[in-house]
Swiss-Prot record:
<dbReference type="InterPro" id="IPR047879">
    <property type="entry name" value="YjiT"/>
</dbReference>
<protein>
    <recommendedName>
        <fullName>Protein YjiT</fullName>
    </recommendedName>
</protein>
Length: 521
């Protein structure tokens, strides 16, 4: 009888334990269902977790739920528990991560009173992320799964650190946005640009993690797109204008929206994006020439001329008609027709809207300048010289960077380029080259000798004059000190050029300030 009593007691305890676990799982399932339904969904749709924008109340509920469920071996294999756990981790990173937390699970475990082994996480995280939320797992370069990095990237940016570093983060973002277009034209991705700028900043170390850099570059892409799509540079209050035409724009960003500071922070980023884009877009209203060389046509240099929507120029004589024939001429000879256009005339000034945004053609005489010419009744009535349309071919070194299956002219004479895969066309006269390993075989470009150069090099070409060409400038080294101030947004030599006197700051976290003596010449 005693054995029977013990057996029945054991079964009763097992049933009670199973019932308790079942109730815990039901609570997780019910909470998730309510969370998803409140966002107008029947099930997760594969978006990043930060785009669900959990509220403070939901985060508190989720914390209490996981504490109540507690540590249980059976939870490890339950999909809905795993989904709650990974959502909590991502929200914890966004809301509660602080500088001293480090890159570890410990603060998360402390918050909810449970912990897991690496093996258990290998079951829980994929079940929650892939099976429930339909989100991928990130990998290290060694091809091992990066569970913590996955959950932190899904949470967005650590908002407590953002608030702590508010002004510095805005300064970093302004610099990224200020160099955005130039980087794209140089074949430099937003991700690479963000990484280079962040590495040289004084932001907390966590912002240099791959997950943070990717989110910041994605934010830069989004902000730039919003400014261009909604033409925000022409509005004094870009935030108010965007509220009218796209009221849900903030939901695209990895910042908590139920925090007034978060809304204010995003407003500041949008204003910064509008300010940085304005001079760049105004510059884009002018003409621009890009020159390409291809190994398939070694004796030809092709040009892409980008044109604005409209151009204005003085008329040399009163035209007999307002219907102009437009063309691009090289040294007085037409090389590309732009078709007819009607001009508006005022005070001997003609304004013409162009039908084409760009034209492409081969250069006959690259050293000659290009002009946009207007004719009326067969007579030239006005012209505009196109900037940077002359190439001193054979006179100075020409530096091309690789661009898909062709080469883009990046600089003439001395220059510094970000690309680490370049082609240097030497002057026609005998040239001495130093700082070049000479392993790559020279090629023929436009009848001139050209040297393929790879990596971070400092090449000196001596002909009638001495020229210095630096390549691979995206490979930035981080020292103990950095200069902090208003950087020039245009290309300068040296690369680090400031408007006014910059401040010397330390890149080491344990040094708060640096005393320097200012000298004047």
């Amino acid at each position: 009888m005693l054995w029977g009593f013990v057996f029945v007691s054991f079964i009763s305890k097992e049933l009670a334990l199973g019932q308790s676990e079942y109730i815990s799982w039901v609570k997780c399932t019910s909470w998730l269902s309510n969370f998803v339904n409140l966002r107008g969904l029947r099930q997760p749709d594969g978006r990043p977790l930060y785009e669900y924008h959990a509220t403070n109340d939901e985060y508190t509920q989720l914390t209490q739920l996981l504490r109540a469920v507690g540590q249980s071996q059976s939870n490890i294999c339950n999909r809905d528990f795993a989904a709650c756990f990974v959502l909590f981790c991502s929200e914890w990173y966004r809301r509660d991560y602080e500088r001293q937390c480090g890159w570890t699970w410990d603060p998360i475990y402390k918050k909810i009173g449970i912990s897991f082994t690496a093996t258990e996480l290998g079951t829980i995280v994929p079940k929650g992320m892939e099976d429930y939320w339909l989100r991928p797992i990130r990998f290290y370069e060694s091809e091992r799964r990066n569970f913590l990095g996955t959950l932190f990237s899904e949470g967005g940016l650590p908002f407590r650190l953002l608030k702590e570093s508010d002004s510095r983060f805005l300064a970093v973002f302004s610099r990224i946005l200020g160099q955005y277009e130039q980087a794209k034209q140089s074949g430099f991705s937003a991700l690479s640009l963000a990484r280079a700028v962040i590495e040289k900043s004084a932001l907390p170390t966590v912002f240099s993690e791959d997950t943070s850099v990717e989110l910041i570059s994605h934010m830069a892409d989004n902000l730039n797109s919003l400014v261009l799509t909604h033409n925000l540079i022409n509005h004094k209050e870009p935030v108010q204008q965007l509220e009218k035409v796209h009221p849900t724009w903030r939901s695209e960003f990895p910042i908590p929206l139920d925090d007034e500071t978060g809304t204010h922070f995003l407003n500041g980023l949008l204003c910064a994006a509008s300010v940085e884009a304005k001079p760049r877009l105004q510059k884009n209203k002018s003409t621009r020439c890009q020159f390409y060389w291809s190994e398939k046509h070694p004796d030809e240099l092709r040009v892409i001329v980008s044109l604005p929507d409209e151009v204005s120029f003085p008329v040399t004589s009163e035209p007999s008609t307002t219907r102009f024939e437009l063309a691009i001429c090289e040294d007085g000879e037409e090389v590309s027709g732009l078709g007819p256009a009607y001009a508006s005339l005022e005070n001997r000034q003609a304004t013409v809207r162009l039908r084409k945004s760009e034209v492409r053609f081969g250069r006959q005489n690259p050293s000659a300048g290009l002009s946009l010419v207007a004719r009326a009744g067969g007579m030239i009535v006005g012209s505009i010289k196109l900037d940077d349309s002359e190439i001193a071919i054979g006179e100075v070194p020409l530096t091309f960077i690789v661009d898909a299956d062709q080469w883009l002219l990046q600089g003439q004479a001395s220059c510094s380029v970000r690309s680490s895969d370049v082609l240097i066309v030497l002057p026609r006269d005998n040239s001495n080259v130093a700082g070049f390993d000479g392993q790559s075989r020279a090629v023929n470009v436009l009848g001139l000798k050209a040297l393929p150069v790879k990596g971070c090099q400092d090449v000196t070409v001596t002909a009638n004059e001495t020229y210095r060409i630096r390549t691979g400038r995206e490979q930035i080294s981080i020292g103990r000190f950095a200069l902090n101030g208003k950087r020039a947004s245009w290309v300068c030599h040296p690369d680090e050029t400031f408007i006014g006197v910059p401040k010397v700051i330390s890149t080491l976290p344990d040094i708060q300030s640096i005393d320097v003596t200012r000298y004047t010449c």
